[in-house]
């Protein structure tokens, strides 16, 4: 169990280092890749998740996936909270590492980039704030995400899961990510949001806990539960 918890922690941290890192790289003043845009960012998220899965193997790196696996009987319910806590902590630590790496660029951006934009480097935010619709978008995105991963995992070709999941993230990000930023993962959003709240970032906005708890905090669990029940009931996947 300890080994798996460490793997969940480290895998999530690495995912966040890639993900939050690419946002910092494309937004902060003075970076080599500033202005690279959303395709650059979404592609890095996809590749970064693939790399994390290649390195750490059979990890969830997502509390919503942990819930789905518990519902399917693949992970004991007693492990749901420990796995989820390890993943959120990984998100916090990964974000802190990125902040240290980009500290000079954060400092240079203080008077040029808005506090809201700085917050959005760490955590997701809606393009249009409408909490019921935002909730539905994250629920649906997560339903597609978890359903896709469960289907991909049925293919036994070595190496197909990390590659397939990376492509799935890329497709969801490009096609469905526009309204909310496709968190689909409490650890992906809450970990960096906590880091944003505690780090000594100059001129920062509040961390918008209302949105963080309601939308990326709760909706992915609902989407994952529906995905688990659908994939098991319709396709017989466990």
Swiss-Prot record:
Its main location: membrane. SUPFAM superfamilies: Aquaporin-like. A motif (NPA 1) lies at residues 62-64. Keywords: Cell membrane, Membrane, Transmembrane, Transmembrane helix, Transport. It holds the Pfam family MIP. A motif (NPA 2) lies at residues 185-187. GO terms for cellular component: plasma membrane. InterPro entries: Aquaporin-like, MIP, MIP/AQP_LacticAcid_Trans, MIP/Aquaporin. The chain crosses the membrane at residues 2-22, 39-59, 80-100, 135-155, 158-178, 211-231. Belongs to the MIP/aquaporin (TC 1.A.8) family. Transporter that facilitates the transmembrane diffusion of D/L-lactic acid. Is involved in the cellular racemization of lactate and lactate metabolism. The transported molecule is indeed lactic acid and not the lactate anion, in agreement with the assumption that, with very few exceptions, MIPs (major intrinsic proteins) only facilitate the transport of uncharged solutes. Also facilitates urea and H(2)O(2) diffusion across membranes, but is not permeable to water, glycerol and dihydroxyacetone. This is D/L-lactic acid transporter. The lineage of its organism: Bacteria, Bacillati, Bacillota, Bacilli, Lactobacillales.
